[in-house]
Amino acid sequence: MSNFTGEEKFNQQQEELEKDLDSRIDSADLPVANIMVAGITGTGKSTLINAVFGAEMAATGSGRPVTEHIDEYENEDIPIHIWDTVGLELDSEKTKESIKAIKATIASKSSSNDKYDRVHAIWYCINSGSNRYQGAELDFIKELHSIGVPFIIVLTQCSGDEDEVNAFEEAIKKINSEMGMDDIKIVQVLALPVKYRGMPTPIPAFGLDELVNVTLKLLPSFIKSGFIAAQKVSQSEKRRECEEIICSYVRAAQKGFWEKVPLINVLVTDDKIMKMFRKLGEMYNTVLSPKSIEEIMKKSGVDFKNNFFGLISPIDMGYSKKITELLNKKKDDGFSVKVSDVEKNERAARMIAFYGYTFIDSIEELWKKLTESQLKDVDMVVSVLIQIINKKLKERKAKAGD
């Protein structure tokens, strides 16, 4: 009986995942994640925010006051809202009132009927060199944790003695366990490289990727795609999410969502492909207008005559296992088949996979070529992206054979 129950649960999870993937087709915009970054003054909150989400996310004076005690940082091109607690000095009587107000604000949001309006995770920052986890600060953490929002303690500025930092983390874990808060995750972070006098090389930044990964595991599924797009630490997470987007389009194509399938080149003005390209670009913080995407599609492409190279092996293209399995219906034929032998929906699915992967490969190369400031120049982005896509299409045509 227990095995049957487990199987039922697995099937239910798979159905929910399928619905989530299919919703990617219809959704217009990425969901915006709300992250509370709390901690006393001097713990490096702004440095942490900028390191994870971009250099200008928490620029001085750019925060919008939500309440007397909370500033909100947002950027129209980045699907994240950061709530930053301001001016906390835990020894003052005034701050104790601030703590109550902050808790009330988060609790109010958490009970909202709009799941996108809630606080989705809390990062509580503690300077690793303070060796202090008691009194008003511990009370504050206990109050915030009691709300039930996913909670992570971030030990910041971890450039000191490794053994001492580890001992401090263990002390925090022990206290948390005694107080029934052992579900709180702890991540050690050095947000920026640090150079000490007499040392030949700086201590490199570390821990940001772990913070992103731990946060993703705790976030509700409906908000994860927005957080992945917003963060700039883990390119592998961005690519994984893009592969899920492509997968949802491949599956939809196999079900017949394309009324008319081009025989040779999909890079024509097609609303569905434009929408997919826009979503893939957003995952890499490359926000492209419909006009820009149309220009990319019209100026990218190769004459493949009657040889549809999108039928080359998914293994050669580096497709994910999930997409490979979806496209593997002609496994016995090894994909060396004529266009006329492939049904319309299957042809559409393979074309979507091919051009989707070509696009994300090109975006990743674009990131390597351009600086952060150059990536804000839309004309430059479009021009360079067209060059990269055409180069990759020619390379892949050669791989498929004329």
Give residue ranges: language-model regions:
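Conserved G1/Walker A P-loop phosphate-binding module
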Residues: 2-92, 287, 291, 346, ...
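Canonical P-loop GTPase G-domain recognition
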Residues: 16-18, 159-224
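Conserved protein kinase catalytic core
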Residues: 56, 90-91, 130-133, 162-163, ...
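Short glycine-rich substrate-engagement loop in P-loop NTPases that contacts/grips substrate
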Residues: 63-65, 95-102
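Conserved C-terminal guanine-recognition region of P-loop GTPase G domains, centered on the G4
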Residues: 77, 100-184
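Short loop/turn segments at strand-loop or loop-helix junctions that form parts
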Residues: 83-88, 125-127, 155-157, 187-193
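Helical mechanochemical/support elements of P-loop NTPase systems and associated helical scaffolds
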Residues: 98, 115, 204-207, 351
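Alpha-helical membrane association modules
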Residues: 209-212, 221-402
